[in-house]
Amino acid sequence: MKRKLLSLVLSVAMVATMLTGCGNSASSGSAQKVGVAMPTKDLQRWNQDGSNMEAQLKAAGYAVDLQYASNDIATQVSQIENMINSGCKLLVIASIDGDSLGTVLEQAKEKKIPVIAYDRLIMNSDAVSYYATFDNYMVGTKQGEYIKQKLDLDNAAGPFNIEITTGDPGDNNARYFYGGAMDVLKPYIDAGKLVVKSGQIDFETVATANWSTETAQSRMDAIICKLCRRNKVRRLPLL
């Protein structure tokens, strides 16, 4: 939580610095408008990040166009396009799919609108000015260490059944989360203390498109019904 707060504060600080550097200080006449594009309202962290960023920017004297895209890529593209055309001087974007914004961000680049990629890396575009994030690999190792501690893997007899799910394959963060967690857990999988009965371990197999909780649940339900009816299951959190 502290790291996400730090990332948020740094994003707000970058907004102020970039607008001032462009001669767009909020104190010079009417308030300059910042577009903030968040992926969804379905997860509390995005609600908190969006509302906190909006509050801090407004407190600093900027107008804010805050939009949530319901995890729909086309909706987010449309929202960003509207922000560009409605006079936003800077964009802060937490992308749904980091590979899908190249075309719309070309419009921002043509209008010389700076772009901050917030928490999720935007790829296939040279329109991004800054990337505000934190140590995502360490987040993954923390998740793995939590499971290691709770199951007492160094001392308990085991074996423990476990199934793995991770985030969107187009989100650079998901690969770091997965890598960090698996670097902690894989030695126990190789030793047989953790058993992945489905055999589904590699990133591409366990990835969840668009971080969809419904897709992740559907996959886990299918695995549990097929393989784990007679066994107790320990689930990894969505990485």
PLM features: what roles do these ranges have?
Residues 2-8, 22-239:
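A residue-level marker of the well-folded mature domains of exported/periplasmic proteins
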